[in-house]
Amino acid sequence: MRVGVLSIWLADRYLPFWVSYLQALEVEVVHPEEDSVNLPFPPPIRRVLGQVFSLKSQGVDFLLLPDVQLGVEARKGSPSPWLVDLSATLERLVPGLPPTLVVPAELSPEVAGLAAKIGQNLTQNPMLARRALERTKHQLSSSFTLPKQPGTRLVGVVAQPMLLSDTEWLGSLRAGLAEHGLHLFLADKTPAELRQEGAYLELDLELPTDLEAAGMHRHLSRLGKVKGLLYLHDPQYLPLPNPLRKLLKKSHPSKPWRLVGLEASWTRLASELAKDLQV
C-alpha cells in the first residue's frame, strides 16, 4: 500500500502526524519528486499540480489531501474551489487522479477517530491500526513554532495561509524585498489566534482561512515593528475575502501598503515600498 503526500498547501500543519501514523501502519509514504507542469496557472498552483502529477506517475494507491477549511462549509457566496474542495478541484484537472484521503489541515486530539477509520480501511487490520494510533497519537497535539524573522524594515504579508506555506514562492518574494533593504515578516501568532483576531473585525466571515487572513491584517496593522503591508490576492485561485478588501478601500491601513497578484514583480514592488518607507 502506497500513500502519496504533498509537501505544500499547509502540509507543515498536519503532515508530521500522518507520516508517522502511516509508517506505523506499515504503509509506504511517497513524497513528490520535482515535476513542473506547463499549465496556465500561477506558480503556487502549478506546484500543487506538479506534485499531484508526480505522485500519480509514481503509482500511489491513495493521495492524502488537506481540508484547509476544517470541515466548515461556505453558506453564502461562491468561494474559489481551490479554497473549499481541493480534492474535487484536482479531480477535474488531473485525469486518473488516485483515490483521495481528505484530512483536516490542523492537528487536534479529535482527529484520532478519523485516523483510526483510515488506518482500518488501509490495512483491514483493526489491531494494527489501534497499535499504530497508540504509538503516534501524542503527535496530534497541535504545536506552533514561532518563525525566526530577523531584520529591520519589516514588510508584513497578508494572504490565504496556503500561499504562505509555499517556501519556494516565499523565497522569491524575500529575494525581491531584500534587493531594496526590506525584510519579509509573517504573522507570529498561531492559526487559531489569527482566526480569533479576524473574528474581532466582525466582517461576517465563515471560512477559517478567510478569518486567518483577516487576522493577519489586524495583527500586522497594529504591530509597530512592521513598517509596511503587502496583501496578496488572486481572484480566481487564492482570493482575499471580499469584506476584507472592502475594509481596505474604506479604511486604508496607516502604513504603506500594496494589494497585488501572485505574479507581481517583487523587485519593482519592493522598490515602490522602499520609497514609501524612505529606505
What are these regions (language model features)?
Residues 1-279:
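An N-terminal assembly and electron-transfer interface module characteristic of large anaerobic redox
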